[in-house]
A protein has these predicted regions:
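N-terminal presequence-like segments and the immediate start of the first folded domain
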Residues: 6-77, 81-158
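N-terminal secretory signal peptides that target proteins for export/translocation
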Residues: 1-4
Length: 158
């Protein structure tokens, strides 16, 4: 009798957790929500993924590069255009890696990055937020860039 109860309990636990896994196996799960990003994003097998190489701002009309916020907005705008041209959206972005350098006065403008970033993520238009890394480095390959960003996107097949 005790073995039968143990077997039934084991089957109940397996069925419960098995069904929970099946319920989330077809969706991207975001957990650990913070103000600007999630701590964890789980992408199930079968999801489509897209990786976009590191990119930075384009020079403005006057030839200058702009400050950190302007460069961040410019770079994410370019990503938005690229994603949309391939049938993806900013909501599909699951990871952002940003590499930044100090500006002309030796200060890293993290607030400027966040200000530009917040125009694209966690908004009414795009409530989604990716996981994110922001790393200060010694230099970037393009003189004048303050930021280089790379992204990864994922979505479930339509």
């Amino acid at each position: 009798m005790l073995n039968r109860v143990k077997s039934l309990l084991a089957l109940t636990v397996l069925a419960t957790f098995g069904f929970a896994s099946v319920a989330t196996a077809d969706e991207i799960v975001r957990t650990g929500e913070g103000r600007n990003f999630y701590n964890n994003i789980s992408i199930p097998a079968g999801a489509e993924t897209l990786y976009l190489s590191g990119s930075g701002a384009s020079p403005m009309e006057d030839g200058s590069w702009g400050d950190m916020e302007q460069q961040t907005v410019n770079t994410f705008s370019k990503f938005k255009e690229t994603l949309e041209s391939q049938g993806w959206s900013m909501e599909d972005i699951v990871q952002v890696r940003a590499f930044a350098v100090a500006g002309p006065y030796g200060e890293l403008d993290f607030a400027g990055f966040n200000s530009g970033y917040q125009q694209f993520f966690g908004t009414d238009k795009n409530p989604m937020k990716p996981v994110r890394s922001f790393v200060q480095i010694a230099g970037l390959v393009v003189e004048g860039w303050l930021i280089e960003i790379e992204i990864r996107a994922a979505r479930m097949p339509k």
